[in-house]
């Protein structure tokens, strides 16, 4: 549950051109970032609720792209973000080395979500097919080649994950997987709250987890992108919040495609020591 917004300038390989615009943003040590290749829509729902102590007002009245703005999206330049009270919430798809200078200076905390790249591919394939502002994915074979070689928006999944896993000051980075959140959302919310130094009662944690269940978020027009005109996102082709499950790649990839994916994955990730839940 995390993809590019329609008002973002999308390219095939990434958004490096936006970095300079954001490079001078004033941040604070208490600013929060959800930096991910997937699951940002989820974090745009969860983190404001943790911050508000479970008050649903913001997530029911404010679109998620204004509630937790995208660093790489031009709308962030007109929201007067520096005037928001600290801690401020941001989301981004940037690679670690693409972050603005103020990020490395002020050292805000980072919540980094990872997901089985096979499911990331599956989700991306459907998303590219419904978003008019992205390059048409064409055949699944064609899109798979692009995905594995990093010729998609925001570049290589492999480089993105490895870059953030090697980030400095890892005590300020929380690594969590989409799978963990699917399997036990209440525990995930509690862990995220602890990382954000927010003291929540079990009742509030339960309330947040219930609201942020996929089936409930799918009904929230402030989070399901139904506010976006169909000329940009045609949700008759594929819903923005599509399935919210683990392992849908098994219904998408052919045997040959899965074998190719596995071979590339083994080669690209052979030196990574982090234990992924999907391995």
Residue map of PLM features:
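PAPS-dependent sulfotransferase catalytic domain
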Residues: 1-176, 222-279
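PAPS/PAP-binding and catalytic site of the sulfotransferase fold
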Residues: 41-53, 176-200, 208, 216
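Generic structural signal for individual residues within well-ordered alpha-helical segments
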Residues: 121, 144, 182, 189-190, ...
């Amino acid at each position: 549950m995390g993809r590019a917004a329609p008002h973002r300038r999308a390219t095939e390989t990434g958004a490096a051109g936006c970095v300079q615009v954001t490079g001078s943003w004033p941040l604070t040590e208490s600013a929060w970032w959800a930096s991910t290749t997937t699951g940002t829509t989820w974090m745009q729902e969860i983190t404001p609720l943790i911050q508000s102590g479970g008050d649903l007002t913001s997530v029911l009245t404010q679109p998620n792209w204004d509630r937790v703005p995208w660093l790489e999206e031009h709308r962030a330049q007109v929201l007067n973000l520096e005037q928001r009270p600290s801690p401020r919430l941001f989301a981004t798809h940037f690679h670690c080395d693409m972050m603005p200078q103020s990020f490395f200076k002020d050292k805000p905390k980072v919540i980094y979500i990872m997901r089985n790249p096979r499911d990331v591919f599956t989700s991306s394939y459907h998303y590219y097919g419904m978003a008019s502002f992205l390059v048409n994915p064409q055949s699944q074979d064609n899109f798979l080649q692009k995905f594995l070689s990093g010729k998609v928006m925001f570049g290589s999944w492999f480089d993105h994950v490895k870059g953030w896993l090697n980030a400095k000051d890892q005590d300020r980075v929380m690594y969590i997987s989409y799978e963990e959140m699917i399997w036990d959302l209440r525990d995930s919310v509690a862990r995220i709250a602890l990382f954000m130094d927010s003291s929540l009662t079990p009742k509030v944690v339960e309330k947040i987890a219930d609201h942020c269940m996929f089936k409930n978020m799918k009904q929230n027009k402030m989070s399901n992108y139904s506010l976006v005109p169909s000329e940009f996102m045609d949700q008759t082709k594929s819903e923005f919040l599509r399935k919210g499950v683990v392992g849908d790649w098994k219904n998408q990839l052919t045997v040959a495609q899965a074998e190719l994916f596995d071979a590339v994955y083994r080669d690209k990730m052979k030196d990574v020591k982090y234990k992924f839940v999907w391995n």
